[in-house]
């Protein structure tokens, strides 16, 4: 399931009329370039690339050139678009859910520390803390729902297709119902991380920032980037394919 994208593959798969979610689905390494331009490819992944460029006065040709010329060593080593759905669900848990759980204690420690030390001179830090706590609690409640309810059902759909049998009816009726809830929670988490980015002026350090301040901002920015890819894999690949598979069966 691993595939290194060649320049030829990249160039022939990008179109201005594709949604930004579809573009990143072709190569998750494109996410870094979209991040640079503030393009929302996860919660807002269903909007066309050209529409976003026009709305935000971005040079579409320049961005496409950057995508097409991405060095091969930076290209994605996973072809997520063609992952088995069960494997993709497992990947999300193993990589992204693990990342969240491992990083929360560190962010808790550092963010609370700089609020105590620098909060008087930088009151915006308390807004950062409030939004971080909101996204933290959202994710800690959200991930078990996926791990214990939605993802096991996706595995059952995959098994049903492989064995040419009808899947047992789930208690939630259709996969669209938990997916709708997961997407709403993704939106909430995405809004909170946007607030953090705005409050920190894109994670710009103040002149009096200490090493703890720097580490905190690095942790928060990495947390945001991982969350964007995490949500993208679900909203733009896993969820639509799970809905299509259930309808097919």
Predicted segments with their positions:
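Small-residue-biased structural context
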Residues: 3-249
């Amino acid at each position: 399931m691993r595939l290194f994208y060649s320049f030829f593959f990249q160039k022939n798969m990008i179109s201005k009329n594709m949604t930004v979610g579809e573009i990143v689905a072709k190569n998750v390494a494109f996410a870094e370039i979209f991040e640079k331009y503030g393009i929302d490819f996860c919660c807002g992944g269903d909007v066309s690339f050209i529409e976003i460029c026009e709305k935000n006065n971005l040079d579409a040709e320049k961005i496409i050139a950057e995508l097409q010329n991405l060095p091969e060593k930076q290209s994605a080593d996973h072809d997520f678009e063609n992952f088995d759905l069960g494997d993709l669900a497992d990947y999300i848990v193993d990589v992204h859910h693990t990342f969240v759980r491992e990083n929360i204690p560190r962010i808790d420690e550092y963010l609370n520390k700089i609020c105590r030390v620098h909060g008087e001179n930088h009151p915006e830090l308390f807004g950062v803390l409030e939004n971080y706590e909101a996204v933290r609690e959202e994710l800690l409640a959200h991930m078990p729902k996926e791990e214990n309810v939605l993802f096991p059902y996706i595995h059952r759909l995959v098994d049903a297709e492989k064995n040419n049998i009808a899947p047992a009816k789930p208690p939630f009726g259709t996969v669209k119902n938990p997916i709708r809830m997961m997407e709403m929670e993704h939106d909430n988490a995405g809004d909170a991380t946007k607030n953090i980015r705005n409050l920190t002026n894109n994670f710009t350090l103040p002149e009096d920032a200490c090493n703890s301040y720097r580490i905190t901002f690095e942790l928060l920015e990495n947390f945001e980037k991982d969350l964007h890819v995490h949500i993208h894999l679900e909203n733009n690949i896993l969820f639509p394919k799970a809905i299509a598979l259930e309808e097919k069966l």
